[in-house]
Amino acid sequence: MRRFNGFIKGINFGGWFSQCSNEDEHYRTFIGEADFKKVKEWGFDHIRIPVDYELFENSNGFKYLDEALDNAHKYNLNVVLDLHKTYGYSFDDGEGENGFFESEKLQEKFYELWDKLAKRYVSRSSYVAFELLNEVTDIKYCDIWNEIADKTVKLIRQYSKDIKIIVGGYHNNAVSAIKDIDIDFDENIVLNFHCYEPLLFTHQGAYWIKTMPKDFRIPYHTSFSDYLKIAHEHNIPLIIDDGVKDLNDTPSPQFFENLFKEAINIACKRDLPLYCGEYGVIELTDINETLKWYLDIHEVFAKYGIGHALWSYRKMDFDFENERYDEIRHKIIG
């Protein structure tokens, strides 16, 4: 499997140009040049920058993004430019499925936006990669998403044959959806997934999961049988089947290796890089338990050369910048 060179150790700048107030003051102040310098000094090689379509409805939107890319280049950081939300579609509960996959008009706005982005940024292909859309939700969108993604790749390829284009699948970029990505692959396509498994651990106490008790806490090395029992009691999704051989076991690097095995095999067969664009642990979790999770998943990322960008640098309920990470941050980054 080919490595995604230059995009091996990354961090998300979530909440800056996406999932935010969409006001100039926020765009100007949430992240600055010093933050690019800091993540470079920490040891990251790239930043994933989520952007919502609203950014480009701001008269200064492209200016803000230009400045971000200039700062990344200044500090020798590569960038994944991720379209996090588009017209008529968001992965967020309550915002989401507002006609994008059914409306040719909304799809045309998606193509028009990527046409603008491609024209403006393919000249930066030495350090910028494009991610077409964040977290397609339902499997029912699989076929139409493949059509949209394929058409968008062809559009971008009119401007550049070598810029890296990152494509994920349904169930919020689940690793199990890699097998159903069906586009006209070329050597500069990157297969993308996200991983927050076991969700009951990484999202313990998460307020946005409606059935999650806000005071719920769980240690990482809980048996899978208990994970399943608790998840069932609270009606919380838990995708562990492909990673578990014995329900008496607890999470380990082998769990993640089993979970990723099919996607790794597909990437090897297609000779394409595999990239985990989001993964992380909510800030409510005990910091030593958090470290255990990161060390296990990183062992598998390193073994197979899987590029990755943890979620997220500042705030956003994950807050890797927070001082609670000061003693262990270097152990996580490696």
For each predicted feature, which ranges?
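Generic structural signal for residues positioned in beta-strands
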Residues: G10-N12, V190, G307, D319
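A short acidic, often aromatic-flanked loop/helix-cap motif at beta-alpha or helix-coil junctions
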Residues: S18-Q19, L199, M316-F318
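Active-site region of glycoside hydrolase catalytic domains
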Residues: E104-T250, E257-I282, D296, K303-A309
